[in-house]
Each structure stands twice: as C-alpha cells, then as structure tokens.
C-alpha cells in the first residue's frame, strides 16, 4: 500500500514539471474559471532562433548567424538592427530577419555582442513592436597556445639543498575559454636542465639533485616549455629561468702555506699588524667564520690572530712588547677551523688545518729603560739633604751604553732639586711644606756614547717628592676678629669668643692653649679647653675719652714637638650703646696707611714720562732758535727741501747749487753761469752777490747798508707769520694791479724760460731737468 502511495506522488510531481514550461512560456496568460468568457487580447512577441556563432569560422563571408522574427504580420514590416557592431559586423535582412556576420570573429577580443532588434513600418518608419535586446555569443575554438607572463625568470636556492626544494613558481596563460574542456589547460615541460631540476604541478620548479655546489657551478640556466592539452604550442610557449645558488658555509679554511716566516723589529707597537696568514675558503665573506688559534708553543699570551673575512686572512699582532735581548725567535703552530660550519655538508674533508709560524725579532737601538714606572720619595721640610732618592735607567741593548740624567725644568719647582750622574736626587734649597707639599719632577735619562755625547735616545720618568711636615708654624687666630664692647658693659660680659688654626698638619688630638700676654686691667681670658677661648669684661665701665680701642696681645700655644707659641693681637673697640645694649657710635681702628711697591713704581714712571716730554719740548724750541740765528728764514730753508727718488749726496745737495739762481730764472732772469762749488761745507747755499765795486752800481755804500738792515729785520722778526700762512687778499681780478694771483688763470707760461742748465749739474738733478727742461720729442710734433 505504501509503495502505491509513493508511485502516485512521483507521478504527480512529473506531471507538474511538464506543465511548468507551458506556464513559463506564456507569462501573460492567467488561469481563469470555466465560467469566464474565452475572448481576450493576446500580446505580440519576438520570435528568433538562439544566436551563436563560432569564432574564426571558415568559408566565404557573410556567415549566417540566425533569424529574428516578430509575431506581427504586416505586409509593410521591415527589420532593423541597432548597436555598436550593427551595420559593420552584423547586418539583418529587412524582409526575412536573417542576421549575417560580415567579419571573422575572435572570441579572445570580443566574446559576445549586444544588439537591439527593431520592427518598423516601411512607409512611416514607425515601430510596430517594442525594441528587443539580444546577445550574439561567440563560441571558442582552441586557437591559442599558452604564453608565459614573462620570457625570463630569476630565482635562487641555497646550495646543497635537499631534493624537492621549491625554487620558483612559473605562470603561463592560455587566452582560450577555460569553460571549454582542455582549451585553456597548460602543461609544463623542461626543455633544458632536467638533470638538476624538475617541474611538479602547474609550473612549480624543484631541485632534482642534492649536489648543487655553488663553488662548482654558481648559476644554472633552464628552459621551460608549455603546451595545452591538445598539444598546441608556439614560439611564445617557452621561458628561460636563471637559478642562482645561494652560498652556505660548507667549506673549511685551508692555509695557503704550511710555513710562515716573519721578521719584525723589537720596537713594534703592541697591537700593530705583524704579518698576514692567508687561507683559502671559497665561501662568500659572510660565511667565512675562520677561527685562528695557537695550538703548540708557549706564546698564546704573546701573540693574537685576528680574522679578516673580506681578505680571507688572519692578522698576527703582538700582545706584549718584544725584546730582542730576551727572545730572538718565536716558533709555534697555528690552527685554522670554522666552528659554525654545518657538518651535514661535509664529505670526508678535514675539519682542521695547521701551519707553522716563525717570527724573527731584529735588534733596534732602544732608549734607556727605567727600573720603575715612577718614583716616590719623602723629605722633611726645612731640611737640606745631599741624597733624597735615586733613579736608575739602563741601556737594554747589548752595547750597554752609559746613561746621563737630568731634570726637565718644566716649572719653577724644578729649581729646588738637582740630580747627579748616578741618578741621585738632592735638594738645593730648603723646602716649605706650607708652600708646596708635593713636587712632581720629570727626570730624563739620555744614552751617551763613548765620548759622553748623547746619541738621541732618551726616556723620561715621573718622580714624586712628598714634603713631610715639621712643627714650624705657631698657632694664630682662625680669622680676623672685630670685637666691640659697650662703655657701660657690666662685669662678666662676653666680648668675643676666639679660636685658632695652625698652618702645619694638625692632628686630631691637637690642643691650643690661650692666655693673655700681659694682665689687662679690664679684660679677662678664659680658656675653654676645646681650642676656643672667651674674652669677658673684668671690672666693667670703660672710658671712651681715655681709650676708644684696647689692644690685647694673646698667646696661643700648640702641643706639637717642639711646642710653638704665637702672639695674636685682638683689637676691642669701645662703643656708645643705647638702653637695649645696641651699638650706636663706634670708631673703628683705621687701617695703617702705606704705599705699596707697585704704586711707587707707577708714580716713578709717571714722573719720568713728564720729564722726557718736557725735555723734548725744550730741545725742539732750542733747535728752532738756532735755525733763526743762521740768518735764514724758515721759508728759505723749506725751499731747499727737494723730494726725489734717487739717492742724495748729503750736504753736497745744498752746497752744490744756489736756490736763488732758480728763483731768479723763474722770474724771467737770464741764464746765469754755473757757480763754482765751495770747498768748505756749508749748511745753506751761499748767495752769489755781485762785487761791491762793479761797474754801474749806484751808491754801493748806502744801498748795501740799507739791504743789510732790512735783511736783519726780516731774519729776526719773531712776530712775522710762518711761511705756510694763508694770505687773504680783499680784492683780486682784472681791475686789480696784480690781477689774478692764481697760476691757473694766467696766459703766460714758463715755456720761454730755459732750464737746460740743470742737465749740467749731474745725475742728482736729473729729475728737475726732466720736469723743467725741454723735451726734444715735443719739437717733432709741430
């Protein structure tokens, strides 16, 4: 019974499926009861076949695609296509609705086309039906081969990788439709390099050998070919892959030599490169972890070997100073290894490599060596000793030359000490610890040859001399005290509390004792036994008229050995006070007036400067008076100052010619004969006067006397203006007798004056001759 029910249900489902398409194909229809009328309006629909076309279709164009058909039956019906490709790629027969393709189609360029179908009236061009959109799909054919995304690939993989290590993922693309079976599937195949690599899966390259050694072959080139499932391949279906092997630390260092020999001087600096130990390690620098060590010999603390991965070498450096006199040769065995290497990469290779190193030390003339790095001596102050301490330096070389000692005078402290040829230090003056408690000396040791001459090799050492204290300073006040007391102070009034210090080294148990040097009538000193003392009023009530300041000599003693006692004076000022005991009037003790040496020196220099200035003024005035006494005025003397670039002849420049001759010629006089030089020296040129009894002279006696009188008056006229005084004339010009006094406005020139006689006066007057003489070249210009 249950089986029958299940069969009936299945039959009902099947009938429902059969009736569903009918309903779907007529969406405009509605089921109505049989009682309703059967007359209703039916909608017109487009009718055409499914539009599909193969790409790259063979045959002559055009190619039939399909038919569009409308349910409208009208004799004037016309079909049209609209769209981007309508009229170019696709056309429709306006009468039948057949659609044709007029070009070969490529699905990889355009997989489908969207068009719009129209049905219009031929006469009116009006739409008889609503436009309908439809699609023409291009069917794919297997007309494309796989193409790599790039022609060259670069990849890397560590050397000595295990088989199956991924290297790179290649990608090739087939432009065909992937939904069509086997059209877009890609098959990869190695064309070159299959002995070291392989392809697994879709383009994954893996290692196929475990012996990929970068030091043997650093790079591999493989060629990969692609094709689709149907075996279609082309020129673009291959790609080249360059695979670089990455270096790993898989090689041990090996010495390039089994024996290394070096020769170095004994004065090589500690830490300086001594030599290089080259090793062979084909790994790259970042994987060279060479470790050098000394395996045989007792010199592990004498030398060190620092690796240099870049140059693939180990650098030997001394850790201690070398001494030829002690060891002339070092011989030891070294080992090179790499502790970071992966032992899985080794194949029977030794993990260690050894070599022999021999270092020969050569002798160098070294400076003297002091036995100690520094010296410390002690000396009591106020003591002069012929020997404080000794320094000792020796020649480390085999020659064992003698040594000379000296103290560098780097400061004034060095003048207190001396050193003899044996290195014994002594003081030449007594020392005061309170001035300098320490003396730091620099002692030089110089190597001397057989004649006692320094060879240039020297060394220095620091010597520290400590001055020990002696009780040679008496105690004194700790500070200056300004004690004051009221004139009506009562008995027992505390005036001031005093304390003491000692410039000597003060021990913890130092004790100072205080006492008055003389008994005072009105002050009392009380020792507190704690290195302080109180000064109090003894009777009270002071008289300011009798004494405004009281001077108390106080004795202060220490407990040193020997005990010293010092005297310090305390000055107590008596002041007027108010009722509250406040000081209202005090006369402080004036400081002693004195003049220091510096002030005296300054005063003396000022007095000396004033005296020198006064003397210079006096000498200048005296020289001016002497010049006037010679009978020459200042303007005449000034006229004889001739400036030129040639060397002068001293007094001969003033005695060899007469300035008055030049003046007479400049004022239009005739050319005079050259005067004879006077044999005796003269300060001024002698004026060549005409003889007293020359023919044509009028009244020679009277005229000569008058000229002499006028000349003396002019020479001794102290009230006359100086020669460089500016003369101001009230009127000047054409209406004046003198007209213009300026040389710029005159029409006359000195061209008619003959100065050729200057050429006869010698080379000293060459400059004047060139300035005033005629130039023969000027005559050629006219």
Curated annotation (Swiss-Prot):
- Its chief place of residence is other
Q: Where is the Cadherin domain?
A: 45-148, 149-255, 256-370, 371-475, 476-592
Query: Keyword Calcium: yes or no?
Result: yes
Q: Which residues form the propeptide?
A: 23-44
Briefly state the modifications made to the protein after translation. Answer: Phosphorylated on tyrosine residues by KDR/VEGFR-2. Dephosphorylated by PTPRB. O-glycosylated.
Keyword annotations: Calcium, Cell adhesion, Cell junction, Cell membrane, Cleavage on pair of basic residues, Cytoplasm, Glycoprotein, Membrane, Metal-binding, Phosphoprotein, Repeat, Signal, Transmembrane, Transmembrane helix
For this UniProt entry, which segments traverse the membrane? 599-619
Spell out the Pfam families in the cross-references.
CADH_Y-type_LIR (PF01049), Cadherin (PF00028)
Question: Which sites bind Ca(2+) 1?
Answer: 55-56, 106, 108, 143
Q: Which residues form the signal peptide?
A: 1-22
Provide the residue span(s) of the region labelled Required for interaction with PALS1. Answer: 620-659
User: Which InterPro entries does its entry note?
Assistant: Cadherin, Cadherin-like_dom, Cadherin-like_sf, Cadherin_CS, Cadherin_Y-type_LIR, Catenin-bd_sf
Which GO cellular component terms are attached?
Answer: adherens junction; bicellular tight junction; catenin complex; cell junction; cell-cell junction; cytoplasm
Topological domain ranges for the Cytoplasmic compartment:
620-782
- Binding residue positions for Ca(2+) 2: 55, 108, 140-141, 143, 176
Q: Which residues bind Ca(2+) 3?
A: 142, 144, 174, 176, 183, 228
PROSITE patterns for the chain: CADHERIN_1 (PS00232), CADHERIN_2 (PS50268)
The function of this protein is: Cadherins are calcium-dependent cell adhesion proteins. They preferentially interact with themselves in a homophilic manner in connecting cells; cadherins may thus contribute to the sorting of heterogeneous cell types. This cadherin may play a important role in endothelial cell biology through control of the cohesion and organization of the intercellular junctions. It associates with alpha-catenin forming a link to the cytoskeleton. Plays a role in coupling actin fibers to cell junctions in endothelial cells, via acting as a cell junctional complex anchor for AMOTL2 and MAGI1.
Q: What is known of its domains?
A: Three calcium ions are usually bound at the interface of each cadherin domain and rigidify the connections, imparting a strong curvature to the full-length ectodomain.
PANTHER family, per database record: CADHERIN-23, CADHERIN-5
How does this chain assemble? Part of a complex composed of AMOTL2, MAGI1 and CDH5, within the complex AMOTL2 acts as a scaffold protein for the interaction of MAGI1 with CDH5. The complex is required for coupling actin fibers to cell junctions in endothelial cells. Within the complex AMOTL2 (via its N-terminus) interacts with CDH5. Interacts (via cadherin 5 domain) with PTPRB. Interacts with TRPC4. Interacts with KRIT1. Interacts with PARD3. Interacts with RTN4 (isoform B).
Q: What is this protein called?
A: Cadherin-5
Gene name, per UniProt, is: CDH5
């Amino acid at each position: 019974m249950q089986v029958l029910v299940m069969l009936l249900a299945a039959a009902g489902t099947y009938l429902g499926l059969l009736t569903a398409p009918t309903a779907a194909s007529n969406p405009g229809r509605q089921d109505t009861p049989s009682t309703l009328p059967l007359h209703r309006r039916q909608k017109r629909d487009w009718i055409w076949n499914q539009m599909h076309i193969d790409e790259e279709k063979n045959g002559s164009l055009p190619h039939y695609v399909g038919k569009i058909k409308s349910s409208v039956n009208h004799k004037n019906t016309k079909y049209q296509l609209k769209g981007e490709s309508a009229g170019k790629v696709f056309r429709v027969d306006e009468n039948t609705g057949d659609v044709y393709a007029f070009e070969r189609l490529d699905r990889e360029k355009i997989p489908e086309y969207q068009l719009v179908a129209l049905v219009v009236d031929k006469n009116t061009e009006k739409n008889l039906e609503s436009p309908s959109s439809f699609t023409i799909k291009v069917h794919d054919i297997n007309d494309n081969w796989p193409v790599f995304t790039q022609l060259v690939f670069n990849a890397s993989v560590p050397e000595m990788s295990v088989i199956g290590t991924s290297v790179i993922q290649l990608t090739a693309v087939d432009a065909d439709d992937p939904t069509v079976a086997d059209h877009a599937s890609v098959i990869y195949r190695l064309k070159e390099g299959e002995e070291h690599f392989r392809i697994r899966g879709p383009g994954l390259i893996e290692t196929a050998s475990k012996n990929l050694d970068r030091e043997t072959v650093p790079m591999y080139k493989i060629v990969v070919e692609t094709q689709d499932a149907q075996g279609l391949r082309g020129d673009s279906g291959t790609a080249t892959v360059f695979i670089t092997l990455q270096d790993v630390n898989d090689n041990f260092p090996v010495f390039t030599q089994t024996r290394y020999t070096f020769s170095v001087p004994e004065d090589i600096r500690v830490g300086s490169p001594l030599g290089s130990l080259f090793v062979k390690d084909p790994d790259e620098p970042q994987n060279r972890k060479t470790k050098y060590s000394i395996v045989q010999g007792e010199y592990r603390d004498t030398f060190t070997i620092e690796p240099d991965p870049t140059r693939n070498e180990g650098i030997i450096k001394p850790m201690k100073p070398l001494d030829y006199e002690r060891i002339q040769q070092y011989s030891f065995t070294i080992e090179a290894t790499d502790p970071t290497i992966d032992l899985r990469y080794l194949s029977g290779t030794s993990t260690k490599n050894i070599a022999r190193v021999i270092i020969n030390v050569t002798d160098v003339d070294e400076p003297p060596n002091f036995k100690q790095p520094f010296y410390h001596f002690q000396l009591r102050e106020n003591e002069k000793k012929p020997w404080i301490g000794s320094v000792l330096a020796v020649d480390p070389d085999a020659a064992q030359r003698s040594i000379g000692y000296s103290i560098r005078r780097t400061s004034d402290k060095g003048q207190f000490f001396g050193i003899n040829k044996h290195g014994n230090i002594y003081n030449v003056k007594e020392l005061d610890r309170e001035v300098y408690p320490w003396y730091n000396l620099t002692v030089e040791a110089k190597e001397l040859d057989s004649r006692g001459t320094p060879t240039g090799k020297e060394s220095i050492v620091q010597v520290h001399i400590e001055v020990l204290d002696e009780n040679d300073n008496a105690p004194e006040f700790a500070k200056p005290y300004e004690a004051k007391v009221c004139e009506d102070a009562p008995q027992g009034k505390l005036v001031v509390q005093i304390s003491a210090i000692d410039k000597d080294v003060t021990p913890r148990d130092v004790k100072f004792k205080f006492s008055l040097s003389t008994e005072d009538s009105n002050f009392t000193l009380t020792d507190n036994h704690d290195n302080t003392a109180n000064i109090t009023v003894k009777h009270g009530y002071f008289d300011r008229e009798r004494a405004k300041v009281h001077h108390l000599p106080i004795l202060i003693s220490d407990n040193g050995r020997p005990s010293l006692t010092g005297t310090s004076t305390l000055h107590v000022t008596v002041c007027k006070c108010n009722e509250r005991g406040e000081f209202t009037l005090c006369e402080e003790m004036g400081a002693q007036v004195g003049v220091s040496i510096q002030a005296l020196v300054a005063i003396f220099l000022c007095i000396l400067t004033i005296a020198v200035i006064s003397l210079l003024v006096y000498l200048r005035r005296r020289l001016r008076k002497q010049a006037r006494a010679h009978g020459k005025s200042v303007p005449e003397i000034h006229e004889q100052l001739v400036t030129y670039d040639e060397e002068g002849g001293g007094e001969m420049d003033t005695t060899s010619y007469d300035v008055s001759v030049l003046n007479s010629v400049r004022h239009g006089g005739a050319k005079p004969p050259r005067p004879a030089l006077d044999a005796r020296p003269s300060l001024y040129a002698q004026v060549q006067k005409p003889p007293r009894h020359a023919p044509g002279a009028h009244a020679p006696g009277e005229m000569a006397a008058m000229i002499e009188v006028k000349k003396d008056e002019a020479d001794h006229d102290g009230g006359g203006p100086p020669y460089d005084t500016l003369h101001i004339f009230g009127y000047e010009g054409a209406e004046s007798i003198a007209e213009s006094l300026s040389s710029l406005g005159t029409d006359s020139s000195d061209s008619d004056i003959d100065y050729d006689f200057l050429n006869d006066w010698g080379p000293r007057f060459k400059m004047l001759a060139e300035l005033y003489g005629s130039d023969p070249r000027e005559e050629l210009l006219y």
